[in-house]
């Protein structure tokens, strides 16, 4: 007879199994984190410096030495990357391969993927015959964004895969975001990677850049508004960087 788990009858409090990823990355870059507010609601919090998460202590120690911060294990995390390093760096030099920037568009509702396209055609669908067919999303950028805000259209799902220019041998990292601000100019970064890299890798800066402005209309009229946006700035081909 199999021995019962100590959590039998207490499943709600049973520690969750950590999620594992089917890729070979060693960590993730994040522009924010989640915390529980006074009302007990989990809310997102934006950062002005990068947070790096990993599941390997050696990687956490290495990025802390490179970019500042102290590795802290997040006991509540169910992710494979359960060690956080809140760095001192808003800008990190990275190496991006020719295929290192990927995006598509996804609409999630109640944890389920309801719409998956490339902005024009379905990328996946419950009906396989619909894959490759027009998805029906708005064509104009502002209309796409407005519809997504109302959960009537998908948001961008951007993934940037890279290694650290300061320690390429440490392994590959990912930055995943749904930022419309980055999405608006992502084609420029893609073009720069292709033009500068000429089929190879490029040296670039991954940065959280401060944006400040004063709206002339709306509830924040005549008040200073500030936020940090993720940016990708291609500097030179990696071959040229090595030669310097």
Swiss-Prot record:
Subunit organization: Interacts with the integrase.
UniProt induction comment: Expressed early in the viral replication cycle.
InterPro entries: Gp3-like
Ranges for region Disordered: 1-34
Biased amino acid composition, Basic and acidic residues: 11-27
Pfam families: Gp3-like
Highest taxon in the source lineage: Viruses
Keywords noted in UniProt: Viral genome excision
Main function: Recombination directionality factor that interacts directly with the integrase tetramer to activate excision and inhibit integration.
Biological processes, Gene Ontology terms: provirus excision
Organism: Streptomyces phage phiC31 (Bacteriophage phi-C31)
Designated name of the protein: Recombination directionality factor
């Amino acid at each position: 007879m199999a021995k019962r788990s100590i959590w039998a009858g207490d499943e709600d409090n049973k520690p969750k199994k950590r999620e594992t990823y089917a890729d070979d990355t060693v960590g993730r870059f994040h522009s924010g984190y989640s915390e529980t507010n006074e009302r007990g609601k989990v809310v997102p919090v934006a950062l002005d410096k990068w947070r790096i998460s990993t599941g390997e202590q050696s990687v956490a120690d290495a990025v802390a030495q490179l970019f500042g911060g102290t590795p802290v294990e997040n006991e509540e995390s169910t992710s494979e990357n359960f060690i956080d390093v809140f760095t001192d760096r808003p800008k990190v030099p990275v190496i991006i391969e020719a295929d290192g920037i990927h995006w598509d568009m996804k609409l999630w509702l109640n944890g389920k993927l309801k719409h998956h396209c490339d902005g024009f055609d379905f990328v996946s669908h419950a009906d396989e015959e619909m894959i490759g067919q027009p998805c029906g999303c708005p064509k104009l950028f502002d209309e796409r964004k407005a519809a997504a805000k109302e959960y009537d259209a998908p948001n961008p799902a951007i993934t940037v895969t890279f290694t650290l220019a300061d320690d390429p041998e440490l392994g590959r990292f990912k930055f995943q975001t749904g930022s419309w601000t980055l999405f608006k100019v992502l084609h420029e970064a893609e073009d720069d990677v292709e033009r500068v890299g000429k089929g190879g890798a490029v040296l670039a800066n991954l940065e959280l850049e401060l944006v400040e402005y004063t709206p002339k209309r709306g509830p924040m009229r005549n008040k200073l508004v500030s936020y940090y946006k993720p940016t990708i700035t291609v500097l030179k081909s990696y071959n040229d960087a090595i030669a310097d």
